[in-house]
């Protein structure tokens, strides 16, 4: 780590406009933008990465860090709609919207209700499954290319239940996963205690996913991606992009730090902040900030060996190099309201229910964080070209699966830009699908 991280990242020099080859700009230096920038470099482009924050320090920073390839359903399904009133009214539940934001959120929720009907939800599941199937292989290629394969761990993960009456729920999950060729198995309380001896003895059963992977730490991975990008001649501009202006179909002008810079091609990968830039090029999308919270505890307080997801509490516990991280909440709340402190208290309470040993020390220290998942009502990202200006492309809106799908999204986007055959049909991910 650097004493002053930005001093190590900031490069306000602008790309040489007369250099040979394609001048390719990537707006957004989260994990998706970093993967796109590296993939564009690999394909011979001269790449400039632009963000007003340090690479990997915004939404990507606080992720749980595991590749959630078994999460194949969109956030909205008929089952979720049936459970929504109970989830919404539960003061310790995972779904919430700040009162001050409800009026603004209504249009998004209306589209969410439509997307959660049986037929569109099933289409969403099929699309997410295709992306997730390809996710681990893409990450393996990406990290091997930068000599950082050790940052990806095949550690397996557990979905756990406390309620003994919910064994059928576990078996239904196993049956569904097997239909999609996702390996998993039932785990009783005795074996669960062997796999994770520090978890609460109140846990009844679990489903174990032996083939799942996790990253050592999301920020550590972003740093490795950025370091490789820089070592290969990539330029980073630490500034805000104020405007995007396609000039016919020959180039794209970006307004950066009161200067207009011209690029041959531009990829918008700015997460939830992509929305306002799209409006500058005539596209309106129902993209919202789905705020997520985490609390990170020190390693020595308690240890788990696998990523643990609580089916009852809707919480993820993730063992990272940065510490033991508890991640949760799905809060449609925009980007301007402050974090709601109650969410951190709820996360700690849920964590204590799963891992009581962690709280043996009354002076336990921890860090808190809140970030903005870019979320569409149908839970699918955009991976597409502008319908009128093909030199302008998009990869954003991955909701809970930004870390999972970042590397495969980069490969798919560059294939589309270069008009190569796609491994996965991308029609469902069009920018104008709404």
Briefly describe each language-model feature range.
Residues 42-62:
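Glycine-rich FAD pyrophosphate-binding loop
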Residues 65-189:
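Dinucleotide-binding Rossmann-like beta1-alpha1 core, especially the glycine-rich loop
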């Amino acid at each position: 780590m650097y004493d002053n991280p930005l001093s190590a990242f900031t490069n306000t020099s602008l790309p040489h406009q007369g250099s040979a080859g394609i001048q390719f700009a990537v707006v957004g230096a989260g994990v998706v933008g970093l993967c796109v920038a590296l993939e564009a470099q690999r394909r011979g482009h001269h790449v400039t990465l632009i963000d007003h924050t340090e690479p990997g320090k915004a939404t990507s920073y606080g992720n749980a860090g595991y590749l959630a390839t078994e999460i194949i359903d969109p956030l909205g399904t008929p089952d979720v709609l049936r459970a929504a009133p109970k989830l919404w009214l539960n003061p310790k539940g995972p779904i919430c919207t700040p009162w001050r934001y409800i009026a603004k959120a209504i249009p998004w929720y209306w589209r969410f209700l439509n997307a959660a009907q049986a037929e569109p939800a099933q289409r969403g599941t099929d699309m997410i499954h295709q992306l997730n199937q390809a996710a681990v292989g893409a990450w393996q290629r990406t990290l091997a290319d930068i000599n950082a394969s050790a940052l990806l761990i095949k550690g397996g993960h557990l979905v756990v239940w406390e309620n003994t009456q919910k064994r059928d729920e576990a078996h239904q999950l196993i049956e569904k996963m097997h239909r999609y060729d996702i390996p998993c198995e039932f785990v009783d309380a005795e074996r669960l205690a062997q796999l994770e001896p520090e978890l609460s003895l109140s846990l009844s059963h679990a489903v174990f996913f032996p083939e799942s992977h996790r990253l050592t730490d999301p920020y550590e991975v972003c740093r490795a991606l950025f370091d490789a990008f820089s070592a290969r001649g990539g330029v980073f501009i630490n500034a805000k992009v104020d405007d995007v202006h396609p000039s016919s179909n020959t180039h794209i002008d970006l307004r950066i730090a009161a200067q207009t810079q011209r690029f041959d091609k531009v990829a918008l990968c700015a997460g939830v902040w992509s929305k306002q830039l799209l409006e500058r090029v005539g596209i309106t999308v129902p993209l919202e900030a789905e705020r997520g919270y985490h609390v990170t505890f020190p390693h020595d307080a308690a240890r788990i060996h696998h990523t643990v997801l609580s089916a009852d509490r809707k919480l993820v516990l993730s063992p990272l190099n940065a510490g033991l991280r508890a991640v949760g909440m799905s809060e449609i709340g925009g980007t301007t309201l402050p974090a709601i402190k109650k969410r951190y208290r709820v996360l700690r309470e849920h964590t204590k229910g799963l891992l009581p040993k962690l709280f043996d020390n009354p002076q336990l220290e921890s860090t808190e964080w809140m970030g903005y998942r870019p979320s569409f009502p149908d839970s699918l990202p955009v991976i597409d070209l502008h319908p009128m200006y093909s030199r302008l492309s998009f990869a954003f809106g991955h909701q809970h699966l930004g870390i999972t799908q970042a590397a495969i999204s980069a490969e798919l986007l560059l294939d589309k830009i270069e008009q190569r055959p796609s491994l996965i049909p991308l029609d469902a991910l069009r920018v104008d699908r709404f």
